[in-house]
Structure formats: structure tokens, C-alpha cells
């Protein structure tokens, strides 16, 4: 075949997964193309105008630790910043920000258009070419005419694959409102026998701010000082709070009423969801308002957050009110809510159905098991959220570039990052509904905190080529400083009087007390670090040292299994002691390590022992 263009890596889709995939690939020095229908819509926020949230905000900081862009973008374009769960322990805290969605989009458009090694090509990816007589990527077709050769292809099509919008009984083929769906690419997947699942999500109407009465509503301001997402924003200041405070725009809170619920109940049969038009599975943790009314019928009211979509614009996003009701019923429903009695809808709410490929079709590198050099990321893997998509995009983009360079693939383990937890969940367990990340999904959540992503990941990022030497040395120095102060606090002692007795106590032991932090050590005659960030890390490390030790021991056991690799060509039917069911599951899943195999549903400890014995036999035979 004659190709018109040639790139090392081609990324299909300019959403949040596609952006991080393309930027990561380009950063590793390979010639990269990003194919998108409209370059001016790169980085668009089609649903909520926000970045972060529980676990999701930590993912953004992990992306940043690998040199990704999402954290920098939201720091530059956010209009309200909060830290969630501040009254709880450090394991569950997480940053969240309201974005000026137009400024965020412009930031990302500018970034992809001005990145070395990256070219943006407008058009629809209509086919993926394979090498003759093999299941290996060779190129991509655009608009049924342009042929692009590629060593690796990353598919990040979001909700576009055979996407259909539902508003009441209206059915509109679309990938997003006013954007055509991808109808050609699904043929490639069907032809190769990839299974497809049908998922559904939705978005609320957009409201005209000028027609809302905010006077009786509860104001929800941002935090002061405002948290930030990128370690490198104001780096000379406290590492997770801004030096230069930005003006923050408040959100407002209102609630549904019994009248709201009556309108919805009387029109349930007219919704696409309950009227039978939608067959796709919707997100459990972000249900439509009609779903809430049905499933929580005894609840008197549901919270609605009124979130500005831009700093100076008129559009308000009513978080909590997505629906597939007919448009005329939507007007009635929205106007039954306090503050919205005279509201004007700028755009109607809608539900959208789309196809995904089950993520069990992927290795933990996000490469497909059926086709070499083909990677998937984002909603196409069955996840929800910009942050989950971006995290997958980063991993897929790095691995696509490494493959093009002929290098070994890259993995993130469960104990290293929430990105690793998510990818392991997806590729091991699969999805029966849109997947959302929570801190509760991780057994290592005390280690995977919001304050330490760069400390956890900077060495791995630097070794990959995703961080500069200057960045590496900056973080290394912080890590060394934390270690120095911990040594000082273990060894330095002061005499204190307690219950009439004088005794010698180390700073380390004092810090174990819940009422004493690093700053309070001054009262006992100890010196303290200048950096607030170093002080915070010391405080957490000491107070939770017992829990960390427990996590470390558990981690050692799991890492032992993770380090035992399983050959790609292994024949499980030849392993004594495995049942037929176990053989079928292992053959389908193709686990890369014994740890991966151990996490598969239905794989018993006895089966893992049998595989380990078999691998030891193979090793002896080769010796």
C-alpha cells in the first residue's frame, strides 16, 4: 500500500485522553500525529466544567508528576479551587477546581498546535490498516482518502463510536451535541471480532445565568489559600498552594422539590431511559435525575450545584440534573427548583449512547491483545471522567512511543499510583457499567495521597524521559531534605515535664501525638524546616508510620508475584491441577505476571501455586 504521510505514532481523538497521549508521545521524541474532527475543539469539556474530585484530583497530580499537561492547564484556567475531605485523613483528601471551559479549551488547543514533534490533522479516522498477513498496526485512513503509515496507533474516541443522543423520543446520531459520530471505525472492530459493549451517559441543560435568582441560594465559595494541581505552578512557593491567589467565582447550591419529583414521575415514560429507547448501561455514580427519583423514591430532595462554565459568560451548569426528558418537560422541571423559577435553557439536557471495547481486551500497557501496536484510552475503555481518560491517555501515549522506538513497555503498578489502580481494575476485572475512580478502590490509599505524587513517581518519569534533569534534581533535593529532617527528629531529644515527671523525648515520638505537628515542635525547642511541604510530609510520615509499615509488608508480598512474568505463549491446558474453567479464564485474559493472574476473578491461590510450579519447571528446562 502507498501511504500519503508517515508518523511514528497516530492518536485518534482530541479529547482529554488524546491530548495526554499525543503530548506524551511527542515529548519522547517520536513523530506524532493527532487526528481530530475539529482542531478548535481539542480539550473541549462537553459535560461538567470541572477538573479533579475524590481520587480524580490525585490522578491529575500523578499525570503532572509524569510531565503531563492537565494540571498546568487547570491551574492556568480555573475559576474556583477546593480541597475535598479536609476534615478527614490525608488518604482521602483531593483537589477539585471549576474551570473556565473556554479558556481551558484554548489553552489545550494552543498547547497541541505548538508542541515539537506533534502535528494536528483535521478529519475522521475511518479505518485502521494492519500489516499483510499479521495482526499488527500499519496505518490509519482519514476521511476515506488520506492514508497515514504508523508504527503505533492510539484510539481515544470517547463517546463518538456509533454515538446517539436521546432527548425524549428524539434520536440524533452524534458523538456530542452538534458533532457527527464515528460510524466507519466500528466496522474495523467488528471485522476483527472485537466485542463491543453499549454504554450511556448524560449531561444536564445549560442555564442562562441572567434568569436565575441567586438571592435565596446557598453560596459555595472556593478555598483560601487555593490549592493547585501542578507541582511546577509557583514552584518557589508551598508546593500545593498558590503563591499568587486568583479571583475565585462562587458556585451556588439549590435543591429539587416535591413538584420537581411529581413532574419527573408523571413523565417517566417519555424519558429515553425509562421509555425503552436506551439500551446502554449508565454510570452508577452519576445517575440522571429521573434515575435518582426512581431509585431513591423516599428522598425528599436532591442537591443541585449551580456551576459557572466560564468566568465572564452567562452559561450555568446545573450539576445533578442530567436527564433525557423531552425538552418541553425539561423547562417545566427546571423551573420547579428554587432560584430557577424563571430560568431560560440555553441548551437542552440529553443522554448519549456509544460503543466501547471491553478493557479486558487490553494488556496493562493499554495495548490490545488482538492487534499489536493498537492502544485504547479514555471513555472508549468504559471509564467516565476527564481525569480517568487523561491518565489512560498518558500511559497509552508513552507505550505507543516506546513501541515505535523499539523499547520495553511501561507499566504503573497498583501500589505506585491511582492510574495503576484504574488500569489494573479495567484490564483485570473489566466493566459492566461506566467506571469511576474512588479512593476506596485502592488497598494502598494511605500511600497514594494527594500530597506525594511527584515523590512517588519522579524517578520513573525521569527514567522514561518525561521529566527534565532540572525537575528531577529539584524533587530529589526535596526527598533528601525530608529524609534529613526525619533523621534529625529520630535522634534529637529534649527534656519535657509530663504528669510531674521529667523525661527525655525525641521529636519523632512527640510527632506521633495527634495534637502535635511539626510547627508545634518549636515550643519544645526543636528547629523546623522552612518548607511547609517538607513539614507536611514529615508529619504524615511519622503519624501514620505504623500503617505504612503494614502497607509495605502487604506490598512486598504482592510485588513478589508481580515480578514473576508469564510467557506470552504459555499453554495453560498443560499445567497440572488447573480446572477447565480456570484454563479458559487465563487463556482469555492473557495475564502478563503472576500478580495479574492472582487478581483475576475465579483464580484461586491453588491455581497460582500450580502456575508458579509450572514456570519453575520451564525455567529448569531452559537452564
Curated annotation (Swiss-Prot):
Signal peptide: none annotated. SMART domains: GIDA_assoc_3. Its cofactor is FAD. Its main location: cytoplasm. NAD(+) binds at residues 282-296. FAD binds at residues 13-18. It is found in: Cytoplasm. Belongs to the MnmG family. PANTHER family: GLUCOSE INHIBITED DIVISION PROTEIN A (PTHR11806), PROTEIN MTO1 HOMOLOG, MITOCHONDRIAL (PTHR11806:SF0). NAD-binding protein involved in the addition of a carboxymethylaminomethyl (cmnm) group at the wobble position (U34) of certain tRNAs, forming tRNA-cmnm(5)s(2)U34. This is tRNA uridine 5-carboxymethylaminomethyl modification enzyme MnmG. It comes from Persephonella marina (strain DSM 14350 / EX-H1).
